[in-house]
């Protein structure tokens, strides 16, 4: 595993202030990452210690997130250096410090997940991460069909949803998924069995540009198609994005059947043991930034 570079003289790492997080969101928007409008606020509320600022004196020049989801599972999320400070090694130093900070926040032998850009995979390998699979971002214009058997999520569904999310994410993140699905503007729908067990879940949220899906979890491709199609009908004509695990061929076919096109590929990687999850039931990941 590669050694952690030292920060140049005058640069420091510190917890982020609220105004820093707003600045991070603005930089992310400029880069075209199109975060959900409430994404960072939710993450801040669930794990306020996850946000790390890189400063030159008192000036914010970069930042990132390191989420402690459970003692045995963390996630390295948003990571950005201000455009005019790139190319001098700050990103390399910040990335390693984030990794080390998260390792310190977790139990020995814990797993850390991340989604990274493809041309940085060798760098992440040097940092101890190993590729699990690729994810594909699809985008297009929403066009779907109302399904009378697709119903709005209710409080009684949450126990099933927490269990489903934990099984398909690789860790129990009940507080996060509860907050995520209750955020302003989120529309979350389910299909239930006759015994009222949740068979499929899909959520869509307002982003800086249009809407983003996530998560989309289902026991079968047909159930996934129905919940996705229903939500698309609710935002008809709007720009939409959905991030699909590439090994899930049914998920890719589903996105393409609604006229969405692949525009971006990233690498899901893990440090430590790789979780045993069945991505064939994941038709849309929650977020590249938060897992």
Can you describe what each PLM-predicted range is?
Residues 95-147:
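Hydrophobic alpha-helical segments and helix pairs
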Residues 49, 132-137, 186, 264-268:
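Short hydrophobic/aromatic beta-strand or adjacent loop that forms the aromatic wall/cage
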């Amino acid at each position: 595993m590669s050694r952690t570079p030292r920060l140049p003289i005058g640069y420091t790492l510190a917890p982020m202030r609220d105004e820093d997080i707003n600045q991070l969101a603005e930089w992310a928007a400029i880069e075209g990452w199109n975060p959900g409008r409430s994404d960072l606020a939710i993450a801040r509320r669930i794990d306020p210690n996850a946000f790390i600022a890189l400063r030159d004196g008192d000036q914010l020049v970069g930042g990132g997130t390191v989420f402690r989801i459970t003692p045995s599972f963390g996630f390295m999320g948003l990571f950005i250096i201000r455009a005019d400070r790139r190319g001098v090694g700050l990103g390399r130093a910040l990335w390693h410090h984030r990794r080390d900070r998260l390792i310190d926040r977790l139990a020995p032998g814990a797993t850390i997940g991340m989604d990274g850009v493809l041309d940085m995979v060798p760098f992440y390998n040097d940092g101890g991460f190993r590729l699990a699979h690729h994810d594909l971002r699809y985008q297009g214009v929403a066009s779907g069909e109302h399904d009378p058997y697709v119903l709005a999520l209710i409080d009684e569904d949450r126990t099933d949803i927490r269990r489903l999310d934990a099984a398909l994410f690789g860790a129990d993140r009940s507080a996060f998924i509860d907050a995520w699905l209750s955020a302003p503007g989120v529309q979350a729908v389910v299909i239930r069995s006759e015994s009222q067990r949740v068979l499929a879940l899909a959520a869509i949220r307002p982003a800086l540009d249009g809407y983003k899906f996530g998560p989309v979890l289902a026991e079968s491709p047909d159930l996934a198609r129905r919940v996705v199609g229903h939500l698309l009908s609710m935002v008809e004509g709007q720009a939409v994005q959905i991030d699909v695990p590439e090994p899930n061929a049914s998920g890719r076919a589903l996105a393409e059947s609604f006229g969405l096109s692949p525009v971006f590929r990233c690498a899901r990687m893990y440090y430590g043991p790789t979780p045993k999850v069945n991505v064939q039931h994941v038709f849309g990941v929650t977020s590249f930034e938060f897992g």
